[in-house]
Amino acid sequence: MANAKSSSLPSWKNPSGKTLLILLWALALALMALLSSWADMPWLSNGKLLIALGFTALVTALIGMAVVPMLVNLKASQVIQSDGPQSHLKKAGTPTMGGIFFVPVAVAIAVVGTQFNPDVIVVGLVTLGYMAIGWVDDWQILKYKSNKGLTPKQKLFLQVAIAVIFCTWLFFYGPTEITDIRIMQFVLPLGFLFWLVATFALVAESNATNLTDGVDGLAAGTGAIAFVGLGLLVAKENPALAFFCCAMAGGCIGFVHHNHNPARVFMGDTGSLALGGSLAAVGIMTGNLWGLLLISGIFLAESLSVIAQVGYYKATKGPDGVGKRLLKMAPIHHHLELSGWTETQIVGSFYLINTLLAIVAMATA
């Protein structure tokens, strides 16, 4: 009934995947246009940020045209959960591990484009580190043809390990005021507590983007908008990392060219863990954890929906060991699917919400 109802909706209420790709481009460029009033930003006036976005998107889309068929030939197909939305069963056979081509491309372009800037190299290594964790997880899933890759403890250990290495580097080579968090016009000195917050942010953000990757074009599109927003926030103080963010945004948009509904490839944990780790690393290095929190509102909502679902189920568990569910299914995008929303309605709505969050983050920075 939900499918029949959605198919009869006007096209503007039930957009196609290609329409969402155009919307994503429009939103990303509109956000960048907000920088036009910042005349003291040479990296904007000479077009470097726009070039980073557009060039990376083009290269990623072109490389994807070669890599996606290779993933199909390698039979790197996503294992679809039988207890998920029934509409997802038709996705069986779609290759995964798409992060293997768009993440390294974006990092490489950012490193070369900033003339091997040390900050970009370090953040790039963090990004590739989280990508490697995701790749191992994806490979295990494909190898054993199940949804069980790395165990939660193994994945958490590796995520924390990379976070600790990154924080150790920042401790010795980062700015002295790195432990201060700016919240609008206020400065909150955290001291040693900052390193615990930073480690948590890296692990939580990478897991949050991973949870968001459940609908065609969702994680990559919201990731692109988040990277553009974060790039705008850090452009004045660290133009090199702004370039990195725009390159990552371009990589995400180039990937959406292949991942919009109906998806020809999924990013897998290879891509989704890298997105969160990358966003968090930039936010931590530039002291923009408050801005990161706002820009990551969609990812935060996805994570909180899972936490609430699990917590409510355990709290209401009866003698028979069965509890009640707060949502029809978690994360929240699956709840919306089971409530009659189409994938493209969810994705389009989340794109718009994430754009508003990015604007709020800039306004309160």
Swiss-Prot record:
Q: What EC numbers are recorded for this enzyme? A: 2.7.8.13
Its protein name is Phospho-N-acetylmuramoyl-pentapeptide-transferase
| Biological-process GO terms, alphabetical | cell division; cell wall macromolecule biosynthetic process; cell wall organization; peptidoglycan biosynthetic process; regulation of cell shape
Q: Where are the membrane-spanning stretches?
A: 19-39, 49-69, 92-112, 116-136, 156-176, 183-203, 215-235, 238-258, 279-299, 345-365
From the UniProt record, list the reaction(s) this protein catalyses.
UDP-N-acetyl-alpha-D-muramoyl-L-alanyl-gamma-D-glutamyl-meso-2,6-diaminopimeloyl-D-alanyl-D-alanine + di-trans,octa-cis-undecaprenyl phosphate = di-trans,octa-cis-undecaprenyl diphospho-N-acetyl-alpha-D-muramoyl-L-alanyl-D-glutamyl-meso-2,6-diaminopimeloyl-D-alanyl-D-alanine + UMP
According to the lineage, what is the superkingdom? Answer: Bacteria
Cell wall biogenesis/degradation as a keyword of this entry, yes or no, is: yes
What is this protein's function?
Catalyzes the initial step of the lipid cycle reactions in the biosynthesis of the cell wall peptidoglycan: transfers peptidoglycan precursor phospho-MurNAc-pentapeptide from UDP-MurNAc-pentapeptide onto the lipid carrier undecaprenyl phosphate, yielding undecaprenyl-pyrophosphoryl-MurNAc-pentapeptide, known as lipid I.
Pathway(s) served: Cell wall biogenesis; peptidoglycan biosynthesis
What is the protein's membrane topology class? Multi-pass membrane protein
State a single Gene Ontology molecular function.
metal ion binding
- Give the family, as the similarity comment puts it: Belongs to the glycosyltransferase 4 family. MraY subfamily.
Which key words tag this protein in UniProt? Cell cycle, Cell division, Cell inner membrane, Cell membrane, Cell shape, Cell wall biogenesis/degradation, Magnesium, Membrane, Metal-binding, Peptidoglycan synthesis, Transferase, Transmembrane, Transmembrane helix
Give the species.
Answer: Synechocystis sp. (strain ATCC 27184 / PCC 6803 / Kazusa)
